[in-house]
């Protein structure tokens, strides 16, 4: 490497490092810089040119032990991460280094994490439903193959459990590959997920990339791009890939921290002025091409349950389907706590899912909507004051509400109930028969935590 490619650290403020280079070889924006700290090499990424031949960089690892005057080498390329079948079953950090202590790792190919989105000509636009085996999702807010799905919910309503169940179902039922990206979430949850996936064997179809809560903001901001780059490789090889991002809010949050550290004036609610640009650069790369597809499921933490906050609101603009988890449904003991009235999907359309499925979904929504309207009357006057017609609506709605629950495979150890994968045809048939009144005489408790309608009837027999 030529000597004039070497700079010196001139200022360190937490994770922000200013480095002075010769004027004729300033590194490009997004180039990776290596700083030799003796016991380790620290990688930083160029974010700004601030004049006087100084570049401002963000560290991807802890800056502990860093001193002014240390040598910094311009690698002349962005951070590059391993791609290919070798990454399956392994656990990586933002730089593409393995952190699972499972021995030596070698990859044939490396891709830079900053890449252009596919062109219009390359993109595919054929809508097709993606079967998840989770009743409430398949019926009310079906996922599109190659679409972007947002999982919305406050703290502790079950986003991560739902993501784990989806990984499990995709691997077992579709034989599909998944890339799980943990962005700024708890290390303990990542650890639990890793060992659960090892136990169930799902790990061999999955690559995991973690940039957890305790890491510098640079790592949390870039780790989503690392996971996406790995998924893009599989897509370009003709695979249908699932990309899980848990949590996309932490991507925005890390961007906000970095923005403040770089001295940008904040915008609404203290977020970075480049919020929409950063989100767009990530989301536009998640798409289907003529070769394969990336279906992305993104958990979105909603600060203080406020959907108008700029972070979730910006995310909404990019999504094809939303799965909203509701605390009020979780309080009823119904899991997954998906709100059927708040959750939406672009492909809830008879041309994509078929007329029967569409009609049943709309009728289920209608009956639950009516039940919601009647709840105020019930709270004041009691059920007995309702008309016979409304009593029937309430009875069926409560059965529908309970039938939307389902035991999950990944939660077996907590619930003691065997997880269920329900094909979409069975889901549609079950709900159709409930709202037609076929099971008006079956107790509502029989519909709670079962898979198909047959299981509910079996459960009813044991109850009587």
UniProtKB/Swiss-Prot annotation:
InterPro entries, per database record: AAA+_ATPase, ATP-synt_VA_C, ATP_synth_F1_bsu, ATPase_a/bsu_AS, ATPase_alpha/beta_chains, ATPase_F1/V1/A1_a/bsu_N, ATPase_F1/V1/A1_a/bsu_N_sf, ATPase_F1/V1/A1_a/bsu_nucl-bd
EC number: 7.1.2.2
Binding site for ATP: 153-160
MF terms (GO), sorted A to Z: ATP binding; ATP hydrolysis activity; proton-transporting ATP synthase activity, rotational mechanism
A GO term from the CC aspect: proton-transporting ATP synthase complex
Gene3D superfamilies: 2.40.10.170, Bovine Mitochondrial F1-atpase, Atp Synthase Beta Chain, Chain D, domain 3, P-loop containing nucleotide triphosphate hydrolases
Compartment(s) of residence: Cell membrane
Keywords: ATP synthesis, ATP-binding, Cell membrane, CF(1), Hydrogen ion transport, Ion transport, Membrane, Nucleotide-binding, Translocase, Transport
Reaction equation(s) it catalyzes: ATP + H2O + 4 H(+)(in) = ADP + phosphate + 5 H(+)(out)
UniProt superkingdom: Bacteria
Family in the record: Belongs to the ATPase alpha/beta chains family.
Subunit description: F-type ATPases have 2 components, CF(1) - the catalytic core - and CF(0) - the membrane proton channel. CF(1) has five subunits: alpha(3), beta(3), gamma(1), delta(1), epsilon(1). CF(0) has three main subunits: a(1), b(2) and c(9-12). The alpha and beta chains form an alternating ring which encloses part of the gamma chain. CF(1) is attached to CF(0) by a central stalk formed by the gamma and epsilon chains, while a peripheral stalk is formed by the delta and b chains.
Protein name (Swiss-Prot/TrEMBL): ATP synthase subunit beta
């Amino acid at each position: 490497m030529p000597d004039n490619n070497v700079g010196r650290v001139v200022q360190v403020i937490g994770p922000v490092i200013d480095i002075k280079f010769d004027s004729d070889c300033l590194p490009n924006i997004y180039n990776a810089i290596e700083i030799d700290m003796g016991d380790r090499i620290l990688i930083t990424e160029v974010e700004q040119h601030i004049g006087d031949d100084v570049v401002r960089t963000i560290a991807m690892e802890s800056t502990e032990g860093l001193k002014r005057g240390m040598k910094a080498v311009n690698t002349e390329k962005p951070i590059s991460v391993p791609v290919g079948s070798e990454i399956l079953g392994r656990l990586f950090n933002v730089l593409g280094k393995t952190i699972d202590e499972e021995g030596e790792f070698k990859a044939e190919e490396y891709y830079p994490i900053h890449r252009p989105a596919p062109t219009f000509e390359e993109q595919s636009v054929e809508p097709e439903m993606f079967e998840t085996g989770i009743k409430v999702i398949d019926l009310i807010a079906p996922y599109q193959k190659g679409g972007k799905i947002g999982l919305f919910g406050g703290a502790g309503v079950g986003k991560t459990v739902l993501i784990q169940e989806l990984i499990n179902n995709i691997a077992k039922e579709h034989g599909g590959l998944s890339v799980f990206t943990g962005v700024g979430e708890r290390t303990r949850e990542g650890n639990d997920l890793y060992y659960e996936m090892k136990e169930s064997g799902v790990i061999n179809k999955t690559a995991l990339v973690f940039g957890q809560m305790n890491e510098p903001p640079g790592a949390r901001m870039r780790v989503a791009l690392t996971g996406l780059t790995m998924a893009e490789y599989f897509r370009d090889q003709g695979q249908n890939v699932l990309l899980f991002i848990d949590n996309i809010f932490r991507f925005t949050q890390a961007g906000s921290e970095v923005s403040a550290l770089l001295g940008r004036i904040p915008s609404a609610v203290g977020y970075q002025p480049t919020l929409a640009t950063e989100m767009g650069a990530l989301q536009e790369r998640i798409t289907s091409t003529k070769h394969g597809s990336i279906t992305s499921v993104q958990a979105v933490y909603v600060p203080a349950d406020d959907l108008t906050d700029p972070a979730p609101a910006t995310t909404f603009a990019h999504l094809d389907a939303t799965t909203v988890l509701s605390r009020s449904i979780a309080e009823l003991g119904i899991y997954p706590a998906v709100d059927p009235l708040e959750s939406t999907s672009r492909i809830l359309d008879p041309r994509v899912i078929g007329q029967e499925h569409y009609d049943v979904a709309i009728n289920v929504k209608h009956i639950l909507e009516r039940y919601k309207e009647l709840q105020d009357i019930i709270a004041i006057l009691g059920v007995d004051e309702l008309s016979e017609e409304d009593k029937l609506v309430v009875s069926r709605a409560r059965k529908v509400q309970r039938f939307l629950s389902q035991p999950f495979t990944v939660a077996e150890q907590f619930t003691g109930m065997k997880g269920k994968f329900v094909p979409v045809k069975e889901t549609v048939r079950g709900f159709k028969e409930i709202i037609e009144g076929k099971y008006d005489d079956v107790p509502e408790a029989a519909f709670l935590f079962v898979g198909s309608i047959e299981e509910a009837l079996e459960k009813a027999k044991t109850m009587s």
